[in-house]
């Protein structure tokens, strides 16, 4: 055989340029790029070195022969002409891979059979023995590629694909192949950052592929150092002494690299099921001193290297399959950008995504982008410098009232209409409330609050402020009130509200609230689909002022949500009749060990998922679509903190029977208390004004009414808005 060979290296699509650079540095000459491959010239030492050190290649193919073919007979003759006794024992094992079509070969299986027959016939005619086929672990793996009438016959020196390093025996639902992860790290500048002693953090690390590949680069570890079986192991052209020399050199480099002080490389993963598999992968790679994986949400991501060094934040966020909800993904990327701006100033960042348009929601300008392919999915690597001059200001910004800054009324073409005497009285009351409550709201950093709640009987409205929007609910007038007069007063109030609060009249939304019955609390009022982001107690929540009777946020339960946030740390939290899971978001923000939220409505659970994603909380926060009573009867888990805020009445088509809070609350509480862990607490609240808690409950549980503790100043005028109790096991 010749001292030099033509090598053909395959790789994922999009890595050709990077692989060409890497292979050239490892000794490959006359390098040319092809789709998903490169080729060049090398001696045996370079071929071995490429197998051992290439972080990017899938396979290293040694080309035995190129020949033209017009039909299947030409294929057979070309393969048969090779002296296979130089490559394989006659009684050895063989596998054939065939790619391409044309020249009478339209079926790859047929093509592979032709190649196999030619090899077997050649060896049998000479030795009297024939090799057998072993597709899983052959002595020799032969590859033939048919390209526009030319057959390229090769030996696969790598055996199994080189991306299979051997450490990742456990993986998540959407794994990134190891060589693709290495390519992303190289494009992101990690070799340079590592050489400077920088840090690396992955806020959504899965089972740690980026982390392990980064550590191997930093510690100068050959990616395939631990591979025991190669495609050349039983090849008769193999030179064991040369291979041992190169392997020993790589082993020495790895030992020297690992002897250095380890770099700070950390990964965080929200899904507790992936933590141990990720740590196991790290240990199998021998990098336990270099790489640490912790459970953590994007919402709390804040890398703190030991020596306060900067470095690279790298992430492969979900982009379609892992969450499935486009809005949830949008908020996840938005939150990732927010954490980068707040906690990673001076760092570099790299986001690998199949949805690059979501990268625009991060609020940081990408200074460089690279195209990749993850299998058949086109992807982009977005690179960022986390520094103020790269921040995109104004995105997602909503008008807010700063302390001392009045609300600005939208320009109008003419003077506001003169108010009637009654309307002016209503406006005066509204302004008085707004002035008093505005100070409290600014102090408590509350975006949304009630400024009026039927303070004047003739104006039976609830007026809620949502930043620079007003949500007005008209209480249905009793039959004794003249409907025409009620309509006049409503119109007076609607004229007064924009003037009194300095609000654009187009941002006043009116609803009519009637006695709740059946499923009306879930009925869609409109189809605008306009969601607005508000803040409360350090969490962000989505409200919809137009489409439903309620907005997605029960303002009167604000103190209860804040209490849950304070008490949730380390607790297993259960939210029954969770609605849009605003209490769950507060529990997660407060450091709950786990959260489970149950509701019958898919609409509101989808909304809940968005609320969680908006704050960087993943799907480890369980959302269960179920009838609450049935769920409690079938569940055996224990919880430390339970919140129940049921509707007054419900007869959804999805549930068995009808729920009536007065009639059914004893059964509900008994079922829920059976799930309460010793030392735990259950909070029960409802808005039925005539509700009476069954007195016999206090004989079984420690019961305390806490209604007065759960009202903020904006609801102090209406202390019957809801009632709340605290229950503990005796």
UniProtKB/Swiss-Prot annotation:
Residues 46-157 form the THUMP domain. SUPFAM superfamilies: S-adenosyl-L-methionine-dependent methyltransferases (SSF53335). Residues 399-408 have a biased composition (Basic and acidic residues). It catalyses: guanosine(2445) in 23S rRNA + S-adenosyl-L-methionine = N(2)-methylguanosine(2445) in 23S rRNA + S-adenosyl-L-homocysteine + H(+); guanosine(2069) in 23S rRNA + S-adenosyl-L-methionine = N(2)-methylguanosine(2069) in 23S rRNA + S-adenosyl-L-homocysteine + H(+). Residues 399-418 are annotated as: Disordered. Coiled coil: none annotated. It comes from the Bacteria. GO terms for molecular function: 23S rRNA (guanine(2445)-N(2))-methyltransferase activity; RNA binding; rRNA (guanine-N7-)-methyltransferase activity. Keywords: Cytoplasm, Methyltransferase, RNA-binding, rRNA processing, S-adenosyl-L-methionine, Transferase. GO terms for cellular component: cytoplasm. It is found in: Cytoplasm. Gene3D superfamilies: 3.30.2130.30, RNA methyltransferase domain (HRMD) like, Vaccinia Virus protein VP39. Its main location: cytoplasm. InterPro entries: 23SrRNA_methyltr_KL (IPR017244), DNA_methylase_N6_adenine_CS (IPR002052), RlmKL-like_Mtase (IPR000241), RlmL_1st (IPR054170), SAM-dep_methyl-trfase (IPR019614), SAM-dependent_MTases_sf (IPR029063), THUMP_dom (IPR004114). Its EC number is 2.1.1.173, 2.1.1.264. Specifically methylates the guanine in position 2445 (m2G2445) and the guanine in position 2069 (m7G2069) of 23S rRNA. Belongs to the methyltransferase superfamily. RlmKL family. PANTHER family: RIBOSOMAL RNA LARGE SUBUNIT METHYLTRANSFERASE K/L, RIBOSOMAL RNA LARGE SUBUNIT METHYLTRANSFERASE K_L. This is Ribosomal RNA large subunit methyltransferase K/L. It comes from Pseudomonas entomophila (strain L48).
